[in-house]
C-alpha cells in the first residue's frame, strides 16, 4: 500500500509539472505555427517574384539575340534554307520541350486533372486562332527584310507596342491608366530615338510593301499575344505545359500546310534540312525558347511585361552590336535609353488602383 501511494504521488508530481509547463509550451507552439505560416507566405511570394524575374530576364536575353541570329543565318543576302521548315522545326521543338517538362511533372506530382493532356473540344478549339496568327507573323518576320534594313525594321517593330496596348484594353477589358498610356507613347518615342542613326532615314523610303508588312505584323503580334494570354489565364490552375502543347500542335499543323503549299517541291527534291547551318540551328533553338518564355510571361505576369521585355531587348541588341559589329552608339541612343527607362518606371507605378 505504501508503495502504491509513493507511485501515485510521483505520477501526480509529473502531471502537475506538465500542467505548469503546458501554457508556455502552448504559447510557444502557437507562436511557432504563426511564424511558420508567415515564413511560408513570404517564401511563396519570394518564389513567385523570382520565377517572374527569371522568365522576364530570359525573354529579354533571347529576344535581344533573335535579330542577330536571323541576319547571320543568311548567306549572300538570302536564306538558303526553307523558312517554312524552320518555323515547323521551332514549333516541333517547343512541343517536345513542353512534353519533357510535363513528363517531369507527372513523375513528381502524378497525373492530375490540371496536368493531363486529355482535354475537351471546347478547351482545345480556341488554340487554332493564335496558332495561325503566330505562323503568319513569324513568316513575315523573315520576308520583311527584303524591303527594309535592320534599323528600319527595329523602328517599324515599335508599332506592335501600341497595338498591344489597345487590344489589351479591348479584348481583356482591362483598364490602363492615363499614366500607362503616356508610358506607351514614351516607350515608342524612346525606342525609336535610340535606333536613330544616319541610315534610319531609309525608313521614309520604305516601299509600300514594307509598311504593309510591318503594320500587319504589329496587328498580328498584338492580337495573337493578347488572345493567347486570355486563353492561358482563363483556367489559371491548368498546367502551362499542357496549354503550350496544344498551341504548338496546331502551330505544327499550320506550318506543315505552309510547307506543302510553298516549299513542297524543294523539300521533296533537296530534303527537309537543306541549307541548314549551325547558325540556323541556334536560331531555331532561340525561337523555341523565346516562345516558351513568352507563354510563361503571359501565365505568370502579363502581355504588357512581354512588350517591355522585347523593347528593352532592342536596346540590348544595340549594345551587343557594338562588340560584334563595331557599331557606334550615338547620343540619340543614350537619350532613347533614358526615355525607355522612365517609361518602364511610369508603367510600373501607374497601374490603376483597385476600387474600394
From Swiss-Prot:
Disordered, as annotated region: 1-44
A Pfam family that the UniProt record links to this protein: Nuc_sug_transp
Known tissue expression: Expressed in roots, leaves and stalks.
InterPro entries: Nuc_sug_transpt
GO molecular function, one term: pyrimidine nucleotide-sugar transmembrane transporter activity
Membrane topology: Multi-pass membrane protein
Cytoplasmic compartment spans: 1-52, 104-125, 173-175, 233-239, 299-314
Disulfide bonds: none
SUPFAM superfamilies reported in the protein's UniProt record: Multidrug resistance efflux transporter EmrE (SSF103481)
Composition bias, Basic and acidic residues: 1-24
Comp. bias (Low complexity): 27-44
Subcellular location: Golgi apparatus membrane
Keywords from the UniProt entry: Golgi apparatus, Membrane, Sugar transport, Transmembrane, Transmembrane helix, Transport
Gene Ontology biological process terms in this record: transmembrane transport
One GO cellular component term: Golgi membrane
TM region(s), chain numbering: 53-73, 83-103, 126-146, 150-172, 176-196, 212-232, 240-260, 278-298, 315-335
Residues in compartment: Lumenal: 74-82, 147-149, 197-211, 261-277, 336-356
Stated role: Sugar transporter involved in the transport of CMP-sialic acid from the cytoplasm into the Golgi. May transport important nucleotide sugars such as CMP-Kdo (2-keto-3-deoxy-D-manno-octulosonic acid) in physiological conditions.
Family assignment from sequence similarity: Belongs to the nucleotide-sugar transporter family. CMP-Sialate:CMP antiporter (TC 2.A.7.12) subfamily.
Protein name per its UniProtKB record: CMP-sialic acid transporter 2
Species this chain originates from: Oryza sativa subsp. japonica (Rice)
Lineage per the UniProt record: Eukaryota, Viridiplantae, Streptophyta, Embryophyta, Tracheophyta
UniProt gene name: CSTLP2
Amino acid at each position: 500500500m505504501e508503495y502504491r501511494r509513493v507511485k501515485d504521488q510521483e505520477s501526480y508530481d509529473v502531471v502537475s509539472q506538465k500542467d505548469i509547463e503546458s501554457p508556455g509550451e502552448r504559447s510557444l507552439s502557437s507562436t511557432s505555427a504563426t511564424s511558420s505560416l508567415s515564413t511560408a507566405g513570404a517564401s511563396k511570394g519570394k518564389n513567385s517574384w523570382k520565377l517572374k524575374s527569371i522568365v522576364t530576364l530570359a525573354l529579354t536575353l533571347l529576344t535581344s539575340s533573335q535579330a542577330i541570329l536571323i541576319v547571320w543565318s543568311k548567306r549572300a543576302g538570302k536564306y538558303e534554307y526553307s523558312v517554312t521548315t524552320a518555323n515547323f522545326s521551332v514549333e516541333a521543338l517547343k512541343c517536345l520541350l513542353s512534353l519533357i517538362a510535363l513528363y517531369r511533372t507527372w513523375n513528381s506530382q502524378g497525373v492530375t486533372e490540371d496536368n493531363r493532356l486529355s482535354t475537351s473540344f471546347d478547351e482545345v478549339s480556341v488554340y487554332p486562332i493564335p496558332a495561325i496568327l503566330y505562323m503568319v507573323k513569324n513568316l513575315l518576320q523573315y520576308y520583311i527584310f527584303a524591303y527594309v534594313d535592320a534599323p528600319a525594321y527595329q523602328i517599324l517593330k515599335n508599332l506592335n507596342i501600341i497595338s498591344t496596348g489597345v487590344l489589351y484594353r479591348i479584348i481583356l477589358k482591362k483598364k490602363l491608366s492615363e499614366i500607362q498610356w503616356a508610358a506607351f507613347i514614351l516607350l515608342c518615342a524612346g525606342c525609336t530615338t535610340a535606333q536613330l542613326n544616319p541610315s534610319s532615314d531609309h525608313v521614309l523610303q520604305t516601299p509600300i510593301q514594307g509598311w504593309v508588312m510591318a503594320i500587319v505584323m504589329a496587328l498580328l503580334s498584338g492580337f495573337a499575344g493578347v488572345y493567347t494570354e486570355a486563353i492561358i489565364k482563363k483556367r489559371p490552375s491548368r498546367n502551362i505545359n499542357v496549354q503550350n502543347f496544344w498551341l504548338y500542335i496546331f502551330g505544327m499543323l499550320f506550318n506543315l500546310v505552309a510547307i506543302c503549299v510553298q516549299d513542297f517541291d524543294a523539300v521533296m527534291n533537296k530534303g527537309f534540312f537543306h541549307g541548314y547551318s549551325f547558325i540556323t540551328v541556334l536560331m531555331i533553338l532561340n525561337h523555341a525558347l523565346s516562345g516558351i518564355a513568352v507563354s510563361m510571361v503571359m501565365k505568370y505576369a502579363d502581355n504588357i511585361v512581354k512588350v517591355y521585355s522585347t523593347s528593352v531587348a532592342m536596346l540590348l541588341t544595340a549594345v551587343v552590336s557594338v562588340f560584334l559589329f563595331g557599331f557606334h552608339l550615338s547620343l540619340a541612343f543614350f537619350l532613347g535609353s533614358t526615355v525607355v527607362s522612365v517609361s518602364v518606371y511610369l508603367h510600373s507605378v501607374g497601374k490603376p488602383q483597385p476600387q474600394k
